[in-house]
Amino acid sequence: ADSPQLRAAKGEALVARAYAHFVLVNLFGKPYNAQTSTTDLGVPYIDFPINNFRAERPRNTVAEVYQYIEKDLTEGLPLLDDTYYKVPKMHFNKKAAYAFAARFYLYYTKWAKAEEMATEVLGDTPTNLRNWIAFQALGNNDPHAKEYTREGVEANLMLASVSSYARRFIDGQTVGRFAHSRGTAVRETFRDANNLWTNNYKDKQYESFRVDASKYIYTKYPTYTGNNTQIVLFTTDETLLVRAEARILQKNYTGAVADLNLFAKAYFMDEPQFTMSQIVSGYQNIPYSSYDPTSKLSHATQKKRLSPEFTIDNDQENLLHFLLQC
């Protein structure tokens, strides 16, 4: 039987399959590289029913996995229909699916397609970016995290439930070295002296908020008892930055700077608007992070050496450094 509802379900299934394999290939394979991905091993692409989950299957190359993902997206996106969802943001609704497609094409180095998919989500001038001012009226513990993941926030395109006992056994001190720590903030991001937006972001008072995980209940099934049970998979903010990056790599600097300024206006207190020359000269004068293998001393800055498999010029590099700070 065929019906509009079944076609919509098929569309979401295709997009979900594409997303699952996208996550897996970037976890177990190398990043996409036009020069090497035809031989780099990726993951098996399961596009057929399986009965034996333990059977060994040959790994597709990274290039093959990306081709299959694109095929699923091309077939699945036109079939989506949000009218069948009771809770759209827990599904691959249209905007979430196009946001994923934008991210995928950015990884796939198909910049024009990434820009096209992002614009499907945002329109030419998005008005649904995250309202960071709303965080100022909240407490600095659970309410802050819950507001970020709240279904009603227009900037949140898709949510997912998660369940993990890791936080019960690994405290913040243990994993702090891998997190956005105070040292990172001082030398590389928010509080760095070279920061173009001068430590002036709208949710600044919550830069050191914490979550009290001292009391918890073990449940048989995932339940929404705290702020660690729901995550945001796609947002308008990230999709805007995907489009900005795609425009930078196409040398559409006017469009890229416009997108970066939309993000800056939403996030920073004085709502700054930068020119391209300000961004390029600002990052041009920042030294690269460095490490001396003899003394084993490191000097961390906002600026890391970028090593893409494609060529970028000076203007593109410095615009990308700005984007990476957003």
Question: Whereabouts are the PLM-identified features?
Answer:
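Hydrophobic-face positions in mid-chain alpha helices that act as interaction patches
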Residues: 113-237, 260-261, 267-310, 317-318, ...
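Aromatic-anchored glycine-rich loop motif in surface-exposed flexible loops
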Residues: 1-82, 86
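Alpha-helix C-terminal capping/termination sites
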Residues: 23, 27-30, 107, 242, ...
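Residues that mark the junctions of alpha-helical repeat units in TPR/alpha-solenoid scaffolds
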Residues: 3, 10, 17, 87-90, ...
